[in-house]
Amino acid sequence: MKIVLVGGGKVGAALARQLSEEGHNVTVVDTNKARVEHIGESYDVMSILGNGSSITTLSEAGVEDADVFIAVTGSDELNLLCCMFAKKAGHCHAIARVRNPSYSHELDFIKKQIGISAIINPEMAAAKEISHLLRFPGASKIDTFAGGRVRLIKFALTEQQGLDGVAIHEIPTRLKSDILVCAVERDGGVIIPNGNFVLQNGDQVTFLATQEKAHEFFQRIHLPVRPVRNALIVGGGAIAYYLSHELLENHVRVRIVERDPARCNELAESLPGAQILNEDGSNREFLLSEGLESTEAFVALTNIDEENVLLTLFAKKHSQGKLVTKINRLEFDDILAGLDLGSIVYPKYMTCDYIVQYVRALQNEAGNNIKTLYRILDDRVEALEFTVHEESKATGVPLSQLHLKKNLLLCCITRGNEIRIPRGGDQIRVGDNVIVVTLEHGLHDLRDIVED
């Protein structure tokens, strides 16, 4: 697909890389010369120095023939203006990043009036992810497939679970659990395991299951499944606002620590059910006096990554509650993964994921087989959901007879309302959706899972 992307910052660069790697014809527009040169030299894309709200610049970028137009500059208003001009100039699907909470209740109206196909609010998306994690606190990461019916869940394996030295093929009979372990992080590496793989304490385990089966599995390995009933949030920005709104609707007691008095007044007016505390969140004595040791969830949402990391490490020392850490910068995710910060939420990653998912949905409408794609475990593993449109070498054959590529696991088959963890005798049929986890990037078709 031909894609015009306005905004070459961290999110724009990440999108340029991912979309170009997936075979799209990408043109990036930015007003910053250094960004334009860096993106043009680093990725297989065309880069243009110019203003994305200029019809001349958009014409140079080829917006008239574009299939998709994406605006992710630092200005909400500029993103909306760019999309409006792009829609006027061509017939593309337009996607805008809009972050200001004051627009949150007007997004449907804006989409309808301007004709934008999708609006992504990364802070709202981050709040929703955190809310999901607080409803299922034993998980450190949750992704969904099959319209939310199938979940890919990550957790840290400790002595408490009693799975040290257990082979994966023993889990169904030993625990009466219908789940499938898809990936394991160990000693800095990632493994796509077979049934003989033996788990060890310290592993980061990712498994696939329905919500009901995941709940049962967590109960049997003594991981918490009851939603949290109270949360202590440090940082009163947009994510804290959206998150608190969701939590209060679910009858969770919410306390927000915010150092800016004016912001505290705003939060108190907009969130009357929350307790707003005007204090420096890095004040350790204050956090302890506010019941850090007994809180069921601690969420670090300041605007400074380093402060969020230190706050979470302090909370980890004093609390047994669920820990969530917001990180803005994408560069140090591999280092942060080794610090055990609980669940790490990257709003910028979410923007990329959402937009890539949307582009893939458009491809699927045009006959492309990939319905959903997640890049997980620090971008080292791809989890893909394929729609089977036609017969191929992967269909109509018992899975035990398929020669699947190395480092690839076929995890789930959904057939109508039926969800199956596949066994050797199962077959893929036309009309199925198939979920695959692999270390290999760039699979585009179900045929790609089978050795040539």
What are these regions (language model features)?
Residues M1-D452:
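Cytosolic regulatory regions of ion transport systems
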